[in-house]
Amino acid sequence: MSNNQILFERAQKTIPGGVNSPVRAFRSVGGTPRFVSRAQGPYFWDADGKQYIDYIGSWGPMIVGHVHPEVLSAVQNVLADGFSFGAPTEAEIEIAEEICKLVPSIEQVRMVSSGTEATMSALRLARGFTGRSRIVKFEGCYHGHADSLLVKAGSGLLTFGNPTSAGVPADIAKHTTVLEYNNVAALEEAFGAFGDEIAAVIVEPVAGNMNLVRGTPEFLNALRALCTKHGAVLIFDEVMCGFRVALGGAQQHYGITADLTCLGKVIGGGMPAAAFGGRRDIMAHLAPLGGVYQAGTLSGNPIAVAAGLKTLQLIQAPGFYDALTAQTKRLADGLAAEARAAGVPFAADSIGAMFGLYFAERVPTSFAEVTKSDTERFNRFFHLMLDEGVYFAPSAYEAGFVSSTHDDAVIDATLAAARRAFAALAA
């Protein structure tokens, strides 16, 4: 038995399914999960000492690569001062100022410890601000594992074939209306029917949890206009795409301003940190100023803030996003070219430093189109690439991520491995 197999068997005795987040279990692709022993730059090494090119980057946070020396130094510099205080620090102000500078729609921001906390808190705030209960979300968009959002969601739920979680009471789910992503007509119909009941619309402007699916400009502009017209709060869930698709996130890319924005992943630099923020008049309803309660023991943790602040400083380097976007596009275009040369039906897309791989004739634009992709062929491709030392997401329904450490040599090695994998698929 390999060390990975030994660890997986051991883990299953004390951890449900042997993992602390379902997609890590390899259930949809089969086989044994890779247990990571260490990581550096664009690589990680598993428990058997095998090196992999890493295209999940902890599901998005590692935009400057694993163990970036300046991020490491920033963390080391604060460790001796204390791990957690439960009281305000100057560093919290510094990261808040940085976030507000980079995302102009955010006038005030509140730090939390996870993306789920961010979206859950933003929805509570929107309901408190509007005095309404109904939430609108979209098929395949994943906004964390709060009850009201686990309805026709993406991510691990979609991976396991049941997009609505057990354990979500009908009395909670009834306040969530689910519409088709990128469907403007359905959106207009919903607002026409019950627009005065809608507290908020929450959306991934670039969805990454049903694979990569871009919101169309028409769809996102319609969202903005309808929310404004009906007094609903527009929430952009940029936990994944924030600081990934552009320095100012999807709002910069599309030129659309949200009322509230949820952030995570990159803002923690690999540490557990997230945030939600937006218009000052809405944020004023949060305790201790207003009646909407939200709190957290580890919110604004000094170690996480140090890693996140340094990461946010690094990504502002001139040309950072131009180079990162170009490398990501080179990967996606190169994979599509290799598949085409082998005669394998395949499509790829990228935006900023996110990419999607689809065993389908074209890039999907909705949840329904994503679910028509050839998952069996994806699973074979995943394992062929894994054998080659390339680690893509172990699910056909997750986006991939490129870091600034994925240089030409890394992309070249990936494409060479893909050439062999597609040839094997076509045989």
Swiss-Prot record:
GO terms for cellular component: cytoplasm. One of its GO terms (biological process) is protoporphyrinogen IX biosynthetic process. Signal peptide: none annotated. The modification N6-(pyridoxal phosphate)lysine is found at residue 265. Keywords: Cytoplasm, Isomerase, Porphyrin biosynthesis, Pyridoxal phosphate. It catalyses: (S)-4-amino-5-oxopentanoate = 5-aminolevulinate. Pathway: Porphyrin-containing compound metabolism; protoporphyrin-IX biosynthesis; 5-aminolevulinate from L-glutamyl-tRNA(Glu): step 2/2. The keyword Membrane does not apply. The keyword Cytoplasm applies. It comes from the Bacteria. InterPro entries: 4pyrrol_synth_GluAld_NH2Trfase (IPR004639), Aminotrans_3 (IPR005814), Aminotrans_3_PPA_site (IPR049704), PyrdxlP-dep_Trfase (IPR015424), PyrdxlP-dep_Trfase_major (IPR015421), PyrdxlP-dep_Trfase_small (IPR015422). CDD domains: OAT_like. GO terms for molecular function: glutamate-1-semialdehyde 2,1-aminomutase activity; pyridoxal phosphate binding; transaminase activity. Its main location: cytoplasm. Its cofactor is pyridoxal 5'-phosphate. It is found in: Cytoplasm. Its EC number is 5.4.3.8. Belongs to the class-III pyridoxal-phosphate-dependent aminotransferase family. HemL subfamily. Homodimer. PANTHER family: GLUTAMATE-1-SEMIALDEHYDE 2,1-AMINOMUTASE, GLUTAMATE-1-SEMIALDEHYDE 2,1-AMINOMUTASE 1, CHLOROPLASTIC-RELATED. This is Glutamate-1-semialdehyde 2,1-aminomutase. It comes from Burkholderia ambifaria (strain ATCC BAA-244 / DSM 16087 / CCUG 44356 / LMG 19182 / AMMD).
